[in-house]
Amino acid sequence: MLNITLPDGSVRQYESPVTVAQIAASIGAGLAKAAVAGRVNGKLVDACDPIVEDSAVQIITPKDQEGIEIIRHSCAHLVGHAVKQLYPNAKMVIGPVIEEGFYYDIATEKPFTPEDVAAIEARMKELIAQDYDVVKIMTPRAEAIKIFQERGEEYKLRLIDDMPEVEAMGMYHHQEYVDMCRGPHVPNTRFLKNFKLTKLAGAYWRGDSNNEMLQRIYGTAWATKDELKAYIQRIEEAEKRDHRKLGKQLDLFHLQDEAPGMVFWHPKGWALWQVIEQHMRKELNAAGYKEVKTPQIMDKTFWEKSGHWENYKDNMFVTSSEKREYAVKPMNCPGHVQIFNNGLRSYRDLPMRLAEFGSCHRNEPSGALHGLMRVRGFVQDDAHIFCTEDQIVSEARAFNELLVRIYKQFGFHDVSVKLSLRPEQRAGSDDVWDKAEQGLREALTACGVEWGELPGEGAFYGPKIEYHVRDALGRSWQCGTLQLDFVLPERLDAEYVTENNDRARPVMLHRAILGSLERFIGILIENHAGSFPLWLAPVQLVIMNITENQADYCREVAAKLQAAGFRVELDLRNEKIGYKIRDNSQYRFPYQIVVGDKEKQENKVAVRRKAEDLGSLDLDDFIAQLQQEITDALVNH
C-alpha cells in the first residue's frame, strides 16, 4: 500500500500504482471533475501519471496558478490541432506559456491573415465542444522521431536533435493531432473553454533574424468566463493607452525606419523629458550624488579590460577609425570607474556617488524593438556608488528610500522586489559571487522589504536587486536596479587608501531608479493614459480667448503663469470657443483656461480641469492652488 500525504496533513492509503486523478476521485466527485494535474513531492505531473512510492500529493485545479498555466499550455496545443485541420501543410514549431497567455509559432507557405486566426479560433471552439480526452503516451525517442518524420514536422525533429540525452518523451494526443511536451496538460478539453486568440505576429526561428520568419499566434486562457472578460477589457484599455498611439496623438515623439530604435522627440515630448530629468537631477543632488559625463565611444581595448567585449560584444555597436577599433558604450559603469581612478582616493572620500544621464546604445534585434519600450539608443538615470563593504547596507537603505519616494511622486505606489542571481556566463569567482549575493540579501533585510529570487538573471558582473512597479492596468514593469559588483573594480584596478594607509578595492554599487528614460516615459504615458499629473505635464495649462478683445489679457495671464514657473500654451485662434475647448482636449492638458470680457474686467480666469468646470477664479488664488497641487504631489505624495 502507498501512503499519500495530502496538503492538510492527512494520510490516505492506496494500492500501487495510483494516479492523481484516482486520488482526486477518492476524495470527492467535485475534486475529480476539477483536477487538472498534480504536484507529487514538489514536482508537477499529469493527472494520469502513476505514483509508485509514498508521496506528498497536491491536486492542482484551475483555482491554482499552476492550473491556469497548464490550461494555457494545453490551449497552445489546441491551436496546433486546429491549425493542422485547417492548414495541413503548416509546420508546427513551439507553443509555450507566457505571462497571462500563450503563443504558438508556425511555419506556413503564406502568412496568416486576421480572417485565418478567426477561423482557427472557431475550429478550436468546435474541438472543445467535442469534450475529448487528451491522452499522454511516454514514447521512446526513435518512435517519436518516426512519428514526426511521417507527419513532415521538420521543426519537431530539430527540437529532438537539441535533446540528445532524452530517451523518451511525453507525446500528447489530441485525437489525430500529436505534439511533444514535458507537460503536464489538461486531461480533457472541457478545461479550455475560456480562451481567446488575441494577436498575430511574426517571429524568427530560434529568435535569430538570420533564420526564417514564422507566424506567431498569441492567445489567452482563464479559469472562468468572468476572468476572461476582465482580461479582454484590460487589453482593450491597454490598446487605448498604447504609448505609440498616444505619442502621436499628443504630439510627443515619433519613430521612423531610417533610425530603427531611435526616437525623434517633438517639443512637447522633449519638454516632458526635461521635466523628468531636471526633477531627477534635483533629487540626486539632494541625496549627495555628483553628476558627471563620460565619452560615448571608447577603444576596444578598454571594453576588453572591463569584460564587456567578452560578455556583451554581440549587443555592442562597433566602428573603426585610423586603424583603431572602437565601441559605442552600452553601459556607463566603466567610464565612472575611470573618473574614480583619476586621482588618489581615500577612505574619507567614500561613499562616492557618481551620477550620469548617460546616453547608451545597444544592438537590439530589429524584431525586438517596440516603441519606447525597447530601443537601441537610450538614456539611463545611471549612478555608481563606490563604497566600503561596511557601507553596503547603509547605502542600499538610502537608495531604497530614495527610489520608493520617487516612484510615489510619479504615481507608482505598488513596488515589488526581486533578487537576480548569478547567470551562467559571468565574470568573477564563485567566492566573489557568494559574497555579493549575500551582501544584497543583507541589504534587503535591512530595508525591511520582502523579495523573490530569480536564479540566473543577474548581470555578468554581479547580482542585482530589481524593482518592479505596477501600473494602473495592473501590469508589472521592471524599472529600478541595484547591483553589487566586486568584479569591475578589480578588472579596472580601482583602489583607495584605507584608514591603515593600505590599498583596497572599493565595492561598486550600480543603481538606476527609472532605468531607460525612454522606456519610463512610455510607461508613464500608458499609466496616466496621457493625462499627466500637473507637475509632470509638458504643457500644464492652455489659455483660450473667446474673442480678440481678450487676446492681450490672455498674454498677461500667460506671462504671470510662466513667471510663476508654469508651462503654458496660448490659443488665440479666431475660432469658436467650443471648438477650441474640444480641440485642446485631445492633448489632455491638466487645465484649460477660458477668458472672456467678464474675466478680463475682474482680473480672473474661468478654469476647466479635465472637462470639469471649476468656475471663475482670482488669478493669484488660482496660481496658489496650482503651487499647492504640485507640493502635494511631490512632497506629500
Curated annotation (Swiss-Prot):
The keyword Hydrolase does not apply. Residues 242-533 are annotated as: Catalytic. Its EC number is 6.1.1.3. It is found in: Cytoplasm. SUPFAM superfamilies: Class II aaRS ABD-related (SSF52954), Class II aaRS and biotin synthetases (SSF55681), TGS-like (SSF81271), ThrRS/AlaRS common domain (SSF55186). Zn(2+) binds at residues 333, 384, 510. GO terms for biological process: threonyl-tRNA aminoacylation. It comes from the Bacteria. GO terms for molecular function: ATP binding; metal ion binding; threonine-tRNA ligase activity; tRNA binding. GO terms for cellular component: cytosol. Residues 1-61 form the TGS domain. Gene3D superfamilies: 3.10.20.30, 3.30.54.20, Anticodon-binding domain, Bira Bifunctional Protein, Domain 2, Threonyl-trna Synthetase, Chain A, domain 2. PROSITE patterns: AA_TRNA_LIGASE_II (PS50862), TGS (PS51880). Pfam families: HGTP_anticodon, TGS, tRNA-synt_2b, tRNA_SAD. Binds 1 zinc ion per subunit. Its main location: cytoplasm. Homodimer. HAMAP family: Thr_tRNA_synth. Catalyzes the attachment of threonine to tRNA(Thr) in a two-step reaction: L-threonine is first activated by ATP to form Thr-AMP and then transferred to the acceptor end of tRNA(Thr). Also edits incorrectly charged L-seryl-tRNA(Thr). This is Threonine--tRNA ligase. It comes from Neisseria meningitidis serogroup A / serotype 4A (strain DSM 15465 / Z2491).
